[in-house]
Structure formats: structure tokens, C-alpha cells
């Protein structure tokens, strides 16, 4: 029996790159948190402390900022592809690279209906996600791209039921035909093509997710999530799979009867913990294997 | 020499009250985090453990939820006034009450341009604040109301200079005539009247703050903040004082010259810590004394 | 082509269970955050909103608290095993269960060298982790247990070098033979046996990890991590694999030469982001397959 | 009526200074988060954007690191005093300076009972606090120093009652003669002398606070807090006032009777929000005026 090195990766996490474009008086801005991880044979570093195959994480930091200039930053998927391919193609010991990106959206300030050229307010709503994985070189090169979002907090004040569930001796929940349903959605999706208008795809997927949450009369959060994933796949042929993780942000009806007050689903306590947590994948039955598409580095995607 | 009890207060912090209105198919929602603190002679509780003058914090929790039904929750200032007056007027040992509220805004989901009746997405931008303090009863009763906001992240990519500053042997900063200026603004303001349309006032003040940040060509964050406060006071005669606390969220130009790349204010590192922190009050020279308007309980306001 | 439901699980996350033992005047306390996830054929809930196979997450909450009484809570691994087996053995539709636990340690208050019977201070150092996965019933039942820790912040002020690394056009890092090395360690390990003294094993593994970090003269964080994992495996035959995730918490030497001051590795800026992030597995070459041991539900392990 | 500038201050917040001493093989380490604020007539900066009186916050950052070398960092109070006096004495426009410090404690790693020379684990328990305010120069100079701690989580599993409280129509709380009492203590104290052994004083005050929490049979958190403050004042003649802020971290008895289980104060749900929050000052009746001792800049103290 011997003790051996197993799977490993290393990189620079959470580079906070802000990129403006100022070729004209009307500036543009992109604001991201990017992490890069390199995979390959780094056993000498682990076993002997020999760094000769190790490109420093400091270099990866420099590269993240330099590529925001050299390659531009007009969509996080393209930027991530450029970075991942660079490491695999240009740095000899690197056999695979994983780039994970969070993007924070800004909205242009409007003054009397006119958009300001160079001032923005952070939108603050959901965080956009992307992850790019590239493995191998030349003809053997394979690429996986996922998009996503997190922290999209969405709520409906009716149109949600929960009853008919399995019971056991520990079950005390009262069935309901009308409840508040709310979640802080995490959704990621695997693109089966690289020939995608990333900006339009992101906006479109978000729109389908939100719209479906609103439109589906819900018998369970599970049912709503499946419909959300299904409708994304129906709308976008270049998406192979959608993964959803949805905490059930409980809104408990507050017992006001003790004070002689009726509470017809009007006053709730929004509780923190514990919370229900539903996770599901929705995919095409002919979807290509996900491979390392969802093998996370920092937990972003 | 004796050891004595000094100023004290107690209450229930961070009640997460969500209130819907569902009288018609088009529902409404308000989502708040409310804290109540009571002030008065509670020395028996401290000195002898005698609770006979102490209304439990659990009761304050119940009251926060009950008042969302009884009094409604159509503006946080009115709701806060109702709660504060209740404690001072109805609970004998209470001589003063402080209500602090954070409000989280939701925006209605739109489907094909039509607003949905009962589904919303958390806006996620700034958090609205209010604090109400009531002291004394009947003719001796005094009331202070402050409004505010926090977490409003705003940035301009040009139109900001910083030079001509004082130097000493520890000064290494390079003057600049063009930099990114960004902050996560906290602003609070003291209403000198209670006869205010709170919703309109909040929207208006936020608009003035954002607009002024955009419009003022900045020679220093201090200068921008003073103008922001000044224009709020000019626009709203019923506001006596504005207090601003603004972290300078540094965006450092990344040195790309090392890689043969020009960086003409295009690529920045958004740093976390440390950060400059500027705080200032702007007020009318005939402003009434602020009294306990800003004597915080939970640090919300 | 059809759209189908892929892998899914659901449960109640972050139940904050505190269990005291008070059979004698000297009380004991265990303080945990426990999440349970159920796996099985829940397609009816997703596809049709039919809950008849779904044990509510509310029931899982009740069960977490009830089992702290019924089964006791003397080690998180045994408690997790009892919960996981209960779901798989007693709830018919459940084919697999995953229990993830964080434990917060308390230390007894000492007064004049005498330990107090019923007062503790939260230790506050690392958080202990465990995850139990059970699949199948009767003879086909399989069980995986991992232990772990997170948030163990450890630093050495010398005995760490970093040089001889690969360079490319983006490399600007200066090699060093003496630097501060610090991390906030996450380590998890897979037990190949269930016949383990869990409390002793945890204390022992933590001790080996800390001791090895101190004793190894480091040429790279990678090398230190491999040694940490290797020595755990050498010391504990019932551990098959160790996984380590270590952010390099950078301590940058502050340039005091600008002020005529020498800085011989004495004054550092502890930076927040970005950070190097090294991840590695160390295992026996005859280790059993990890199976779902590390298939996380909440990201705890 | 004119609009004028009110009270203002500015500085550099949250400088993360780490200072090692390595004169001998046995190193020492101090790890702090320090903020400095300057007060004076900075109206030209606010009103006209004229920075000629403004020492940049970047300079304050440099100074914080430089002083960790020049003045050393053997106690945060002495380091804070040196910084504050420097700004007031050496920088002409500065009339007052406020230095706020958080300190994170490290404990030396022990290997087989022998302390390691240069490896530590972050203790992780409470955060130590200090704030220094200096106003005026030469004979007119006044100085205030407060010490403190935060995040000290302490719990007793019995020895706490709560009954006999005031009731009103919203009161539903059940009185109890035996409950868990827990808090995450914030305590700050005002030193009436500068001739203090700061390290011994801090350790002593913490010890009195913890011991008193344990020893007092509690009829209310208020009563416990008053005793904690009183005993600190009795023990340390050079402390004039103690301020305590204590969230009541509720541990709710879980209703296990529904499952046929007895719960004799053994199984609790540790709730997050809302929480009771008790704040009180305990002082000598001849205490000097606190002046600006507690006028916070960053909310640290």
C-alpha cells in the first residue's frame, strides 16, 4: 500500500476585475469576480516542493487583468474562453483550465429620462455566473461552458399549494391550498454549443425562469422547478441541461388570532433557518455527457 | 463613590415582518426588518431582577406583527410612528420608544409587458431606512423621524479628480485628474415635519442624491457629499439635516505597462480593504436640535 | 428528443439543534447545524405535483430535533448515521439519505481553575464537519462517512519559501526564501470503517494537520498540504482519503523603505482578495471508491 | 436661512496590519484591523473641493503600517495613542483624531506539549477592541481611551429565570424558572487613567465578565449585565464606565411532546432572528464625562 496524490488543482480565486470602455463619451462598464484554476501533472510540487511546472497564482492574477484589456470584456463567456484556452494552449504543463466568473450588473443613472454617460448604480439583483472548462490541445481540445445566476429572490403571494404529502410519526405540518412561495434561486445551465449570443441567451433564460415561476400554479416547489427547467430547454435548443437549487424561504403565517385579529394570508414571519432546499436537474434525454462542466473550483457554479 | 446604572434600553431586534395586501387580485407587498427599543426607568430589573415594569421582548415581537395588520404597513414611517406611540402611550413604564426599520423593495414581475398580480423579484438595490423616536406623553410628547438608505452602490468612471492635497513624510499618493469614484452610500435625513408624503419624499431624496453624484464634477468625495446633502435640503423644506457616510470603494488602476499594454483608465482592481471613509452632516443653520433622532439602537440608522 | 428529470434531492437545511445533557449537576452541551437530504424516485412531485411520496422537509426538521433526544447527540457521526439509516430504512420511497453536520465547539468556563458546571464560551476556532450517506436497505445497504473541519486559520511567520516557479510574459512575482504562510484550512477525510472512536479520531486528525503545518519546512503550500494528508493517512489506518482546500491568505510585505524604515519580514498587509487557492486529494492507492461520500448537498463538506 | 456643513470626519478604515517580532527564534505576532479618522476644519474640501488641508487617506494607510514598525505594536492601546497623537501633534490642520482597533488573537501551536516558535492558530473567540480619541495640542490636549471586546458567545444551560414581567394584550410569553441564557457579548469600557497595564487589564476585565455571567443566578439578562459591569468597576479603579450590549440569543425548547418524547430542557432550537437586545451602561457616580470616548467612526466600538 502506498499513499499517493489524487486529483488536484490550483489557481487564483476572486480577482475583482472592473473594465470600462471609454472610446466615446458614453462609457461602458463590466464588473466581475473571476477565478482561474489549472489542472495537470503538478505532482513534483506536491511531492518534492519543485515549482518548475507551476505558473504562480500571482501570474494568473496578472493575466486576468491583462486579458480584460487584450481580449476585452464584452461577455463573460468569451472572456472566460479566452483565458481558459490561453492556459491550456500557451502554458506547457497545463492540461486543463477552469475559469469561474461572477458578474455584478450596473444600471445607468437616468436624469430627467436621459441616461448618464458615465454614472451607474449597482443593480443589486441577481449575480450572473459563467464557468468555462477547457481540456486538451489542438484537435483533442474539448470545451464546456455553463451559464447561470444566483441570489435571484422571487416570491409569489398566492398560487401555491402544498398537500397530499407522505406522513410519518414525526409529521405535524398542516396541508395548505394557499401559501407564500419564495426562493433565492440558483440556476446553472450547460450550453451544448459555443456559437451562442451569450448576452441574449442570458437575458432570455432569466426571463423564462422568472416568467415560469409566476405563471405555473404550484403544487410543490419541485413541480415549479421542473417547469422552469423544461421551458428553458424548450426555448433554447443550444442548452442541454439546467440545474436548479432552490431554498424554500419560509414565510410563516403569524398567529394573530391570539390577539383577536384575523390573518388571511396577510402577515408573515420571514424565517432564516432552517429552510427547505430542493435541487434538481432537467435535461434532454439525448444531452451530451456533462463531463467536467459542473466540477466546481470555488463553489461559484 | 457608588456604582450606578447609566442609560439603558431594551427591545426586540430584527423582526422580519412581511405584509401582503390581497383585497383585490392585484396583491401588494411590504417586506421589513423592524426593531423596537423601550426606554424608561427599568432600574428594578437591572438592580434587583424585578421584571414588573418590563414588557417582554417577546411581546414586542407579537406587537410588531399585530400592528402590520391592525395599523397596516403602507409606509414604514407611519407604521413606526404607530408602534412608537403605542409603547409610550399605552405601556405605563415606557417613557421613550425607538423604532428602527429596514425595508427591502420588490419589483413586480412583468410578462410581455404586463405586470403580474402576485409575483415579485427582490429589487436588491439599496435598503430603505426609517427611525422613529417618541418621548413623553400628551402635550409633552415629542417625536423625531429620520429617513434614509444604505447599500446604494454608485460609481462614475470619469468626472472625478483628486490633487492638491496636504503631504507629509508618509505621503506617496500620486495626484490624479481622472479617476473612478465609487461608494456604497449610507444617507439618513431628519424630517422637521410629520406632515410628509413619506413615499414621495423617499423617492425624491434618492433621486436627488443619485443625480447629484452624477452631475457634480468632483474634486473630492467630500465636495460631492456636501453637494448631495445641500441639494436635498434645497429641494425639501421639511428636511432639516442630512447625514452621509461614504466609503471610498477604491478602484485601483492595474499596472499593465509591465506587459506592454496601455491602461488608459480601462482596467481596475476593485479592492476590499482598507477603504477611505468620509462622513459629513449638512444642515440648515436654523435646524431644530436633532435630539435623540440619531441615537441608534441596532446600528441600522 | 424528450425533456426529462435528472438527479434530484430535497431536504431541510441548517437545523440549529442544541442538545444539553443534565443528568448530573455537571451539564454537557453539543451545538450543531444539521441538514438532511433525501434521494429516491420523486418524479411524481416534479412532473405532476403529486406529493404522495414526499416526506415534508418540515418532518425532517422535527426528526432532527427528536433524534437529538431519542438517539442522543454524543458524536455527530453516530447521530448522522442514525438519521440517515432512519430515512432509508423507515420511509419507503427513500432510497438514499445524506446528512451533513457542522459542529460548533464550546469550552467550559473556568473560575479560579475550577471548571463551571453549566457555563461555556463558544470556542470559536474551527468548525467540525461530518457527512453521512446511506444508500439501499438490508444486505444491499452501503454507508459512507466523512469527517472534516473548516475555518481553521493557521499561520507560520517563517519556514516557508517560494521560488523556482514557471514564468511566462505575465509573471512579475519575486521569488522568496522567507515568507509568511497562512491559510484558512478546509479538510475532509473519508473513513473506510464505521468502527471508529469518532471523538478521538477527530482530535487526532486535527492534531496531525496542525502539527504537520508547523513542522514541515515549506517550499510550496502544495508540498505542505500533501504532507498533512500523508501523515493523517499514516497515523489512521481507518482513513482512506484526505481532501484539502487551502486558500493562500496572502500577507504582503509592506514597503516601508519609502519612509526610511527597514522591514525585515515584520510588517505585513493581510489582503482579502484575490487569494491563491490550492486543492488536493491524498489517498491510499488501494482506497475503496469514494462513491457518493463527497456528493455535497449544502456545500458543507 | 443657509445650508451649512455640520460635524464631519474622514480617514482610512480597516487597515489589516499584521506585525511580527523576530529578534529571537521565538517569534511574536499581533494581528489588527485599524481605522483612523481625522477631525478639524476641513470645510474648504467640502465647500470648494480644496484639498490643501486634507492629508490623504492613503497617507493614513501608510502611517498605520509605518507606525507598527516605528512605534511597535505591543499593545493596541499604546499603538493607538501613538497614532492619534501623531495626527494631532504633527499634522497642522488636524484638531482631533480617532483611532479604532480590532485585534484578532492567535494561540501558539503546541507539539507534544512544547510551544512552537513561529506557528499559530487563530484563537477565533472574542475580538478585542480599543478606541483612542485625542483632541487639542500641548497643555490643552485631552485623551480618551476605551477598551472592549465583541463576539464573545457565552451560554449557561441553567441558572436563569424569567417571570413576573409586565403583561399587556399582546403578551403570550410563558414565565419560566429554568431556561438557557446565551448572548454574543459586546462590552466596552472607559479608562479614566492612561497609566494602565493594558494587557493585564484586558485579560482581567474579560475574566470578570465571564466569571460573573457564570456565577450570577439570573432573574433577567438585565440583572446579569449590571452585575458584570459592577464587578468590573469594583475590580479596576481605573475604569470609569462599562457599556454592555447583549443580544439574547434565544434557545427555544423544541416541542417533542408531539412525538411522545419528554424534553426536560435538553433539546433546543437556536434561533437567528428576531432576538432580544439589552443595552446598559454601568458607571461610577463620580465618573468623568465620557466626552467623545464613544463617538464611533466605523461602528467598531
Whereabouts are the PLM-identified features?
Chain A
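N-terminal intrinsically disordered, cationic/polar leader segments
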Residues: 1-301
Amino acid at each position: 500500500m502506498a499513499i499517493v496524490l489524487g486529483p488536484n488543482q490550483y489557481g487564483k480565486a476572486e480577482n475583482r476585475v472592473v473594465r470600462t470602455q471609454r472610446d466615446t463619451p458614453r462609457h461602458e462598464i463590466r464588473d466581475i469576480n473571476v477565478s482561474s484554476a489549472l489542472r495537470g501533472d503538478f505532482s513534483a510540487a506536491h511531492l518534492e516542493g519543485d515549482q518548475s511546472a507551476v505558473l504562480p497564482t500571482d501570474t494568473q492574477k496578472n493575466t486576468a487583468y491583462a486579458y480584460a484589456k487584450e481580449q476585452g470584456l464584452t461577455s463573460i463567456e468569451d472572456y472566460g474562453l479566452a483565458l481558459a484556452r490561453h492556459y491550456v494552449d500557451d502554458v506547457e504543463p497545463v492540461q486543463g483550465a477552469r475559469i469561474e466568473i461572477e458578474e455584478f450588473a450596473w444600471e445607468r443613472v437616468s436624469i430627467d429620462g436621459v441616461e448618464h454617460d458615465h454614472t451607474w448604480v449597482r443593480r443589486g439583483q441577481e449575480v450572473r455566473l459563467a464557468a468555462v472548462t477547457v481540456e486538451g490541445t489542438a484537435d483533442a481540445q474539448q470545451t464546456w461552458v455553463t451559464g447561470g445566476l444566483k441570489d435571484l429572490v422571487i416570491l409569489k403571494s398566492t398560487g401555491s399549494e402544498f398537500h397530499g404529502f407522505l406522513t410519518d410519526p414525526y409529521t405535524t405540518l398542516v396541508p395548505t391550498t394557499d401559501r407564500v412561495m419564495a426562493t433565492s434561486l440558483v440556476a446553472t445551465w450547460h450550453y451544448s454549443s459555443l456559437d451562442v449570443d451569450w448576452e441574449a441567451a442570458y437575458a432570455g433564460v432569466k426571463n423564462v425562469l422568472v416568467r415560469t415561476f409566476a405563471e405555473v400554479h404550484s403544487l410543490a416547489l419541485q413541480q415549479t422547478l421542473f417547469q422552469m427547467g423544461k421551458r428553458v430547454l424548450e426555448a433554447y435548443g443550444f442548452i442541454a441541461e439546467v440545474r436548479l437549487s432552490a431554498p424554500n424561504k419560509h414565510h410563516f403565517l403569524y398567529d394573530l388570532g391570539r390577539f383577536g385579529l384575523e390573518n388571511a394570508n396577510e402577515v408573515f414571519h420571514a424565517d432564516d433557518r432552517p429552510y427547505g432546499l430542493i435541487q434538481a436537474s432537467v435535461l434532454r434525454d439525448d444531452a451530451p455527457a456533462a463531463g467536467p462542466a459542473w466540477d466546481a473550483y470555488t463553489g461559484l457554479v
